[in-house]
A protein has these predicted regions:
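Glycine-rich nucleophile elbow surrounding the catalytic serine of serine-hydrolase chemistry
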Residues: 173-183
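Short beta-strand element of the alpha/beta-hydrolase
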Residues: 94-102
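N-terminal cap/lid segment of alpha/beta-hydrolase-fold proteins
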Residues: 32-92, 141
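Gly/Ser-rich "nucleophile elbow"/oxyanion-hole loop immediately N-terminal to the catalytic nucleophile
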Residues: 156-175
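Serine-hydrolase catalytic-loop signature spanning alpha/beta hydrolases and amidase-signature enzymes
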Residues: 104-107, 128, 154
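Alpha/beta-hydrolase active-site loop
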Residues: 140-161, 183
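Active-site loop/turn elements of alpha/beta-hydrolase fold enzymes
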Residues: 102, 126, 133-135
């Protein structure tokens, strides 16, 4: 998947969090500051028992994200002060999925429920977009629903340029994101 092999199963979580290309995206990699602090002493190979994540998939995902950021691929599009979309576009007039990660409306678990899933969907021939929606004190109705609407509006407005098929798409989510997707309709 990734061309770059900057990270390996022996890389410490600390090294990932403090990698220059991820400086602006630490919260997206793992939102909880407490968990980020605890993880720092462990290598990525501990991800299976620490986080329930497949180590190979995690390492491939981190290397792919690192490549995208360093190659200046459009990685994040802010749509509001605390919301936006992460495009994972393969083009080719393929359909798309808008992924809405969970996080109990307190945070957004973007790495495992967004980025990892988006790359898996890309491999299956789908364009994918990961929604970052308002959480915490900003998660009052209808703010998160408005953020989903903003993501979809941005996708539809930019679909021709990205070569994304807007006739066939899905909105899906995990946990709080699943609730949000179901609320969307």
């Amino acid at each position: 998947m990734a061309r770059n092999s900057k990270f390996s199963k022996n890389t410490l979580f600390y090294q990932v969090f403090h990698s220059p290309e991820f400086a602006d995206y630490q919260e997206a990699l793992y939102p909880s500051r407490m968990i980020r602090s605890l993880l720092q002493i462990y290598p990525l190979r501990a991800s299976r028992w620490l986080l329930g994540l497949d180590t190979t998939v995690l390492v491939d995902t981190l290397n792919c994200l690192s490549d995208r950021i360093r190659q200046k691929t459009e990685f994040y599009v802010p749509l509001g002060e605390s919301s936006g979309v992460y495009p994972f576009v393969i083009g080719g007039r393929k359909p798309f999925v808008l992924l809405i990660p969970g996080g109990a409306y307190a945070e957004v678990c973007t790495l495992n429920e967004g980025f990892m899933m988006a790359l898996a969907l890309n491999r299956m021939g789908w364009n994918a977009f990961v929604c970052k929606y308002r959480v915490g004190k900003e998660a009052h109705f209808p703010n998160p629903q408005d953020d989903v609407a903003d993501c979809l509006q941005w996708i539809f407005q930019n679909a021709a340029q990205m070569e994304v098929n807007t006739e066939d798409y899905a909105v899906c989510g995990f946990s709080a994101g699943g609730h949000l997707a179901a609320s969307w309709g």
